[in-house]
Amino acid sequence: PSGYLHLTARENLSIVADLKDVERKDISRVLEIVHLTKDADRKVGQYSLGMKQRLGIAMALLGSPKLLILDEPTNGLDPAGIQEMRSLIASMPQTTGATVLISSHLLGEIEQMVDQVGILNHGKLLFEGSLQQLQKHSRGGILLRVLDAPKAAAALQQQGVKAAVPA
């Protein structure tokens, strides 16, 4: 997320509101959604990374978009920040009316925030559906490509992992 560190959150949001031609009264609404109301008049340079992430989301929410796209929204956050971001994202469809699209490489992280998933590989949609459908269709294993498959399988088996070498 970007913002002017020497300005407050409210000042940063005022700039974005002007750029988006959004009424400034929308600033209070988005600050409340992202739980930054009490810190709105602090300089952004004093914010934690999680607070900066939430400010970035507030900027995106100005003007009430129908779709919000977040790329790795929990990346770099500490455990408390991750939990806070998960909760915020999970509540956003109800609090904002927006559809939230999240890009992430961490399926475990996604499972804690969403009810529908889409899996892309090299630009091709491989799966789209509910988490339950994904779990039902998963193979329950992973395919590894290694230089020495028999040696890798033996090492995994020594660690108690079920492994097989395809013929």
Language-model-detected regions and their locations in the chain:
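ABC transporter nucleotide-binding domains
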Residues: P1-I102, L107-N121, L125-F127
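Short acidic-hydrophobic catalytic motif
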Residues: Q132-K136
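Short, charged/small-residue-rich alpha-helical element at the C-terminal edge
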Residues: G140-A167
